[in-house]
């Protein structure tokens, strides 16, 4: 139970609430996800990469694109400055990497463990989501810049974005 009533005050278990928020995002229950992660962002001065990413997904669903971009940029900077990269796992199979590139897994919520163990993939997911947001906002130059980052050319959404950009900018 994530909310316990004690002496007419509520005590919220934030770990359980975070896990519930991940489930809400992955089931596209955006109203519930948004309120969950907004609460967690408000109650935590130090926001984790996973929290920032998940809140950015909620902002994207709410069409609050500038807020989503700001959170993703913060998460990207935090990823660069943490020791998370020292815990990087090797990907066991090229097939799993190919699946990552061709899927929309980057639109799913992140757990803290996923960030801690897969920093390079998380960085790629942040960049892919940023690209999608800049495409929606028709920020073609930034979208092209993002698409040129390492491994982005292998991603299905990036390939599709480049085709769209070409059609929009050559007419």
Give the label of every model feature segment.
Residues 11-43, 129:
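Alpha-helical segment of the N-proximal tetratricopeptide repeat
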Residues 12-13, 47, 115-118, 122:
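Structural signature of alpha-solenoid helical repeat junctions
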Residues 44-45, 78-86, 153-157:
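Alpha-helical junction/boundary sensor with strong preference for TPR arrays
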Residues 15, 19, 54, 122-132, ...:
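"A position-specific structural signal for the A-helix of alpha-solenoid helical repeats
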